[in-house]
Amino acid sequence: MSAILPTEADRRLLSDIKESITDMQQQMQATYSNLADLKLVGESHDKTVRITMTATYNFEDIEFDERALQGGVKEFKWRIREAWKNLCETIQKTTQSKTIELLQSMRIPEDIRNLSVEEEGGEGGEGGQGTRGMIGNPIASGG
C-alpha cells in the first residue's frame, strides 16, 4: 500500500486550521479572563438581599438590610435563595452572551469555510463524515 502525500494546498489548509485553533484558544482564554473580572449581582424580589459574584462564579459579597430579617429565618433563607437564583440566571445569560460574541468574532480562514461548500456536492450519509459540512454552517453549528 502506498502512502498518499499531502499537496501544498493540504499543508496550507492544515496550517490554517492549526492557526485558527490557536487563535480560538487565545480568544477563549481572554474571554474567560474578562468574565473573571466581571462582577454581577443577584437580588431578592424586595431588594433586601444582594449577592455579588464574578461571572466565573467566584463569591464576592452578600449584603442585606434589617428588612431582610423580617419574618424570621424561613423568610430570610427564602430571600437568600431568591437572590442566589437571580444571580445564577444573570451569570448564565452573561456567559452565554459573551460566548456568542466570541464565536461571532472568530476569524475562520476562507479555506476552512469552503470545506462545507465542497463537501455538500459529494456523497452524503454516514461513513465517517464526522463534522464535515458543519464548519462555517450556521444551521449545522447551532447558530
From Swiss-Prot:
Stretches the record annotates as Disordered: 118-143
Domain of life assignment: Bacteria
GO molecular function, one term: DNA binding
Biased composition regions of type Gly residues, renumbered to the chain: 124-133
InterPro entries listed in its UniProt record: YbaB-like_sf, YbaB/EbfC
Pfam family, one: YbaB_DNA_bd
UniProt name for this protein: Uncharacterized protein CBU_0658
